[in-house]
Amino acid sequence: MTSEMRDLSREECLELLADSGVGRLAVSGKDAPVIRPVNYAFDQPSQSVVFRSAPGSKFYALLRQNTAAFEVDGVDQVAHSGWSVVVVGATEEVTNPADVRRLEGLGLAQWAPGDKPHWVRIRAWTVSGRRITASPPGPADGSDSG
């Protein structure tokens, strides 16, 4: 089996972000990096990853540091293929009433229990991604068992 890896264009990355719903949020914790899964939406008008949060360590770490990384991916373990998109950017609480109303209209369902009254946005500084695809062995690589 051979594989090929290629970089994704920004447009491909944004499309994958828009089509997915769960990713991993990475922030610097007090003593070590902290990575948490979050369900999210991609807000097209602001080109931002948005999610709900409750007051607590993750929320306050985001606002205190004003920076985070966010990763989303898709993997096919049988086909040995997949993709990954990483967003790095500034974090901010969304407080503008018009923006909050627009985000409420995205239909982001809350997965985790508890009240999550705060909207957080990651405004992307960088968006990058990669895709790996695998091809079955064949005559071209000399491994045809036919």
Residue ranges of each PLM-predicted region?
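Extreme N-terminal tail/first-helix region
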Residues: 1-19, 146
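Charged, gly/pro-rich active-site loop segments
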Residues: 2, 73-146
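Charged, amphipathic alpha-helical segments
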Residues: 8-11, 52-53, 59, 105
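Short beta-strand segments
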Residues: 20-54
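Short, surface-exposed beta-strand-loop junctions and turns on beta-sheet-rich folds
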Residues: 31, 57-59, 136
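Helix-adjacent hinge/juxtasegments
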Residues: 51-66, 71-77
